[in-house]
């Protein structure tokens, strides 16, 4: 449609711009009204209206001047010479190009992703292949056909395609949007054309068959994962809680787990409760936020997560008193921060790149609650016998009815 309009650009009339402007604003208003907020946020909608209005004004002035030249008459804007009208057209074209560049810049900041150099992107290729080969060997020894792998700090949303492992992260315009919505509802990262496992708790990662985690340091072993392989500065950890691709869930649990009106922490605590946990799986612990950073003084050994208020800050850095650091990118997407396992007396600082105050809420993982919920799901599981891109076969011994 845009190309057809461009082909007939010289024949466009003043009234054509008015009609197109009204139609565009109307379409935008209808789209925003029926949007659920995860596709088109308020800030993005406001910016779209501003840019759309700018284009309409620029085109109206441009074609008004054009009609004045064609008709060679003086209209309401006063006596303007033909040469002046030509200058006015050039100015409007310049304004239009400037508005387009600003829109591209804004759109990238809202929906784009950080880039990395080719050198950095493939720097650890051999090490990745080495630990992934070890993961495959270990899985085969255990008779496991299917499992997923993720990185604690990925370079892009498509790292799985580069290194050749199966993940629960995808960047694609053809993805299932409902998966993205689910990820967002339970504190993971999601958007219009991607979903990412960032922010997953042990229960969620277990449900996604996430068996292995790749990290760039040897300090990530803890009660929920163990170090099983390493190559260079690349380390492979195996998660304690992993479910196979197929597992049974009680229909009563599915019906009762309505997370639509719950925040991401409440949604997970509710699921754990329905699966038999006697205590909340995630419990709030003290934290303090000031301009530029937030601090958590860990009182007891625990795996720590954190949520935060909506923010325009794009990146945060975690600094732990034991020497570990971790970077979080695109935090404006609003996912839960996985701060890792910390012992009593450890201090965790979360600094942001904009030197702004970002109020966080920290949570400690209750391992007993997580274990209870996991064991409930692990009671009836499917033993996979083969799989391909289009077919999965397996067997399961169902002792209690439910949904696979």
What are these regions (language model features)?
Residues 91-403:
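Soluble catalytic regions of membrane-associated enzymes that act on cell-envelope
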Residues 1-127:
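Contiguous transmembrane helix-bundle modules in multi-pass membrane proteins
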């Amino acid at each position: 449609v845009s190309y057809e309009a461009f082909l007939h650009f010289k024949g466009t009339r003043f009234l054509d711009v008015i009609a197109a402007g009204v139609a565009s604003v109307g379409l935008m208003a209808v789209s925003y009204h029926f949007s659920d907020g995860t596709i088109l946020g308020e800030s993005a909608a406001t910016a779209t209206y501003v840019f759309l209005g700018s284009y309409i004004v620029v085109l109206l002035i441009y074609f008004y001047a054009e009609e004045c030249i064609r008709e060679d008459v003086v209209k309401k804007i006063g006596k303007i010479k033909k040469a002046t009208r030509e200058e006015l057209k050039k100015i409007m074209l310049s304004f239009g190009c400037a508005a387009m560049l600003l829109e591209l810049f804004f759109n990238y900041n809202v929906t784009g992703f950080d880039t990395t150099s080719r050198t950095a992107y493939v720097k650890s290729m051999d090490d990745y292949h080495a630990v992934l080969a070890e993961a495959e060997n270990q899985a085969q020894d255990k008779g496991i056909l299917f499992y997923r792998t993720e990185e604690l700090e990925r370079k892009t949303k498509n790292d799985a395609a580069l290194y050749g492992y199966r993940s629960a992260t995808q960047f694609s315009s053809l993805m299932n949007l409902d998966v993205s919505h689910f990820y967002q509802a339970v504190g993971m990262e999601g958007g219009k054309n991607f979903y990412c496992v960032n922010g997953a708790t042990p229960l969620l990662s277990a449900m996604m068959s996430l068996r292995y985690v790749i990290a760039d340091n040897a300090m990530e072993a803890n009660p929920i994962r163990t170090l099983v392989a390493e190559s260079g500065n690349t380390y492979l950890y195996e998660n304690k809680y992993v479910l196979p691709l197929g597992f049974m869930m009680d229909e009563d649990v599915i019906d009762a787990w309505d997370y639509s009106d719950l925040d991401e922490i409440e949604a997970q605590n509710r699921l754990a409760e329905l699966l038999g946990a006697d205590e909340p799986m995630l419990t709030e612990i003290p934290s303090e936020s000031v301009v530029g950073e937030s601090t958590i003084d860990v009182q007891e050994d625990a795996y720590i997560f954190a949520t935060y208020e909506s923010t325009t800050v794009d990146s945060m850095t975690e600094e732990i008193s034991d020497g570990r650091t971790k970077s979080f990118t695109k935090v404006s997407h609003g996912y839960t921060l996985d701060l890792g396992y910390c012992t009593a007396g450890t201090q965790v600082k979360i600094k942001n790149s904009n030197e702004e105050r970002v109020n966080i809420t920290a949570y400690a993982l209750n391992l007993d609650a997580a274990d209870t919920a996991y064991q409930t799901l692990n009671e009836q599981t499917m033993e996979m016998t083969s799989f391909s891109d289009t077919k999965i076969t397996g067997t399961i011994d169902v002792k209690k009815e439910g949904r696979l």
